Amino acid sequence: MKAGHKTIDKSYMHVSLIFYSIIIFMNMPDFIIFETPMEYKPVLYFQRKLVDLRNNDKIDDTFIFLEHNDVYTAGVHYRGNDDIIRVERGGYETYHGPGQLVVYFIINLRERKMNALDLIKKIQNSVVNTLKYYNIESYPMLNEKTGVWHEDRKICSIGIAIRGFSTFHGMALNVNTDLSKFNRIMPCNFSPDIMTSMERISGRPFNINSVRERLIQSIEKEFDIKEKNIYKNVDLVGYGNGLLP
């Protein structure tokens, strides 16, 4: 070695690179996709578990994409006495079922320097941009009409809840939804005929997997997500307990 030259500790660089890679990996959000319709309650318990993990920095932001089997739920404003499943989200009654694309957002608002309204607007923008790709004009609404609308019909419902600094629940986009299922309730405190779907507007069914992929792209852009982990059909019990999906 010539005088004045310094040696480089390559082992230190190697360890540092590994550590840096781990940090980058851990800060990548998780996109969880369920490819068959899911029962509602197990997924509700799953969300609650993920919120606790997110608040304790055990997981990163998580986006859950799925369809549900037929179910009716009601948010904190509902005052009825029937057997509808009560949940923590805002809003009134709604229906979930096959043909409806649901996304749950487990987001740490503090880390993203956002508030609840910021999140709702990002969800709305993601949906509007997705529908625009399919030549469906839509617009966001807030307050008692929170969601995304086409003309005078509601195509996407939005309702979130916050525990600690993290959110759960999210949005439901009617793709090929059987709209007659809304007839037994007052969806979002409106008449059942207020609801519409991509299929009804366009006069044809859509491939819900393709719509999901387009929505994922819109969400990535809106939330400035450059990289992500994708997991499919995860174990609702094992996920987040130190087990890889």
Curated annotation (Swiss-Prot):
E.C. numbers: 2.3.1.181
**Superkingdom of this protein's organism:** Archaea
Name the UniProt key words of this record, in alphabetical order.
Answer: Acyltransferase, Cytoplasm, Transferase
Residue(s) at site: Lowers pKa of active site Cys: K154
Which residues does the entry assign to the active site, renumbered to this chain? C188 (acyl-thioester intermediate)
Which InterPro entries does this one have?
Answer: aa-tRNA-synth_II/BPL/LPL, BPL_LPL_catalytic, Octanoyltransferase, Octanoyltransferase_CS
Named in its record, the pathway it takes part in is:
Protein modification; protein lipoylation via endogenous pathway; protein N(6)-(lipoyl)lysine from octanoyl-[acyl-carrier-protein]: step 1/2
- Reactions catalysed according to its record: octanoyl-[ACP] + L-lysyl-[protein] = N(6)-octanoyl-L-lysyl-[protein] + holo-[ACP] + H(+)
Location in the cell: Cytoplasm
> Record's Gene3D superfamilies?
Bira Bifunctional Protein, Domain 2
Q: Which SUPFAM superfamilies match?
A: Class II aaRS and biotin synthetases
Q: Which ranges carry the BPL/LPL catalytic domain?
A: 38-227
Q: Which residues does the record give as substrate binding sites?
A: R89, G90, G91, Y92, E93, T94, Y95, H96, S157, I158, G159, G170, M171, A172
Set out the biological process GO terms recorded for this chain's protein.
protein modification process
GO CC, sorted alphabetically, is: cytoplasm
Q: Which GO terms describe its molecular function?
A: lipoyl(octanoyl) transferase activity
Give the protein family: Belongs to the LipB family.
HAMAP family noted in UniProt: LipB (MF_00013)
The misc remark on file is:
In the reaction, the free carboxyl group of octanoic acid is attached via an amide linkage to the epsilon-amino group of a specific lysine residue of lipoyl domains of lipoate-dependent enzymes.
Q: Which NCBIfam families match?
A: lipB
Outline what the protein does: Catalyzes the transfer of endogenously produced octanoic acid from octanoyl-acyl-carrier-protein onto the lipoyl domains of lipoate-dependent enzymes. Lipoyl-ACP can also act as a substrate although octanoyl-ACP is likely to be the physiological substrate.
Q: What is this protein called?
A: Probable octanoyltransferase 2
